[in-house]
Amino acid sequence: MTAKMLHLVRYKFPSLEPASLFLIPGSFLQERFRRDILHRAVIYEADNDRQGTASSKRRNEITCSGRKLYRQKGTGHARVGDASSPIRRGGAKSHGPKPRDFSTKLQTQVYNLAMRIALSTRFINNELTILENPINLSQPKTRILLEVLKQHKLGHEYGKALFVLNDNYFEDESLKNNNLLLASRQLGYHCSFIPVGEFQVRDALKFGKLFIDSEAMSLIVEKFAQRNTLSDMDQPASLTAYVDANSSSFTKSKPEPSLSL
């Protein structure tokens, strides 16, 4: 059985003009909204991100004498013990935190489904855009990137934009030579750039607009798509079909909602 393919329009950056078509499994961005699945995935990510390193001193860890501070009777006040008592200044912390592991477990299929649901929700709401590689600016100027964001109604005023790029963009040499990443260092209030290896379900949900480059999207599809969907495909998820923007088979008019954003 041959899996149906979904044709997504891929856009150039920073002009956001249609450039070519990008093929993914048809069911990948058509998952039904499930709030319970998303909740489980977000809690799972938050639990695993907790460091669990908080540590306070108990009574046996306080450096002080074990001598009783006052005699038991005759003072007219409540009886007291030694200086390590939790009710005294400089004393121990009663029932305080100790290093522990907060991580929880979640089935891989459930987490993969949550990622597909999150991306499907952004796709249905026209908040997901696929970008064509390479992604760069003419100059490493913050002013230029800010003008691009305002031109396309992006940024804090319209919802912070998230750019998910291939891990190669964040290597030492690429990071120094990429004008886009250099220009974005002072615009954390308006946009964020993360490698696809750090992309989580929370990231797909909390940002106003989501931009993913085609190479990163191929990795996401390969990792989170259903196994039977990938095995039934005639072509691998990373294979793309280029279409000349000037040809009759591709128009620059607004694409249909069922095909692209």
Swiss-Prot record:
The keyword Cell membrane does not apply. It is found in: Mitochondrion. GO terms for biological process: mitochondrial translation. InterPro entries: Ribosomal_uL4, Ribosomal_uL4-like, Ribosomal_uL4_dom_sf. One of its GO terms (molecular function) is structural constituent of ribosome. One of its GO terms (cellular component) is mitochondrion. Coiled coil: none annotated. Belongs to the universal ribosomal protein uL4 family. Component of the mitochondrial ribosome (mitoribosome), a dedicated translation machinery responsible for the synthesis of mitochondrial genome-encoded proteins, including at least some of the essential transmembrane subunits of the mitochondrial respiratory chain. The mitoribosomes are attached to the mitochondrial inner membrane and translation products are cotranslationally integrated into the membrane. This is Large ribosomal subunit protein uL4m. It comes from Schizosaccharomyces pombe (strain 972 / ATCC 24843).
